[in-house]
């Protein structure tokens, strides 16, 4: 952990030099996730845009949020904190629910603080990406088969968004009981006037068979393999919105094709 904290200090100095040279704002993003060993965190890549240069960290508990906040406050123009409450147990507020946003708010006084919801940004970005790929087609996403592997919070939101566009959405999750409940709930939530319905299967190869699009939304579990690409349509579009959902063999095969 100390190594990554030192890297934060190093990258802050690096983006500060770039920002002064190119007259750009600087920003640091603090994201949070429930999947962890509660000890480590990792840094996101440094990204430079027209008006801002930024990087960030994905963290697993409030004590790490506290340490990072003290390091970056006043060193960047903006600090963005993920406001989604994904962590159950607090390791700072005894007897209270975990709250990364609160921890950051209490320890930021110099930089401009803003909040965001990481999963919602991902859903909007993915929706824009996939819909734009079909912009020259008369039906758009209508009737396209889209397979979503990993029907958690993120996968479920994506499924709802795409079925509303008229796509044939199939979802997969290892826990069959939750998979059935999610499918039922999503079909209740979607507009009554939307004719398409979300389907499910606990057979992952059945879900991806003849798919136009395969979306991997598992958290740190490589799930998309070569066999899935062979079972899908020739020009299947594969998107990884999780954390490394595509196996190396599948990437190699896709490059070859």
Mark where each language-model region is.
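N-terminal ligand-binding/catalytic initiation module
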Residues: 1-108
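Generic hydrophobic/aromatic pocket-lining and core-packing "Φ" positions
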Residues: 68, 158-159, 251
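Short glycine-/small-residue-rich Rossmann-like dinucleotide-binding loops
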Residues: 84, 218-220, 242-243
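Short glycine-rich, flexible loops that bind phosphorylated cofactors or substrates
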Residues: 87-88, 222-224, 246-247
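Rossmann-fold NAD(P)-binding glycine/threonine-rich loop
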Residues: 100, 104, 232, 237-257
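A glycine-rich, Thr/Ser-enriched phosphate-binding loop motif common to dinucleotide/cofactor-binding enzymes
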Residues: 113-132
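Glycine-rich phosphate/diphosphate-binding loop of Rossmann-like nucleotide-binding domains
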Residues: 132-216
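Rossmann-fold NAD(P) dinucleotide-binding segment
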Residues: 209-210, 220-237
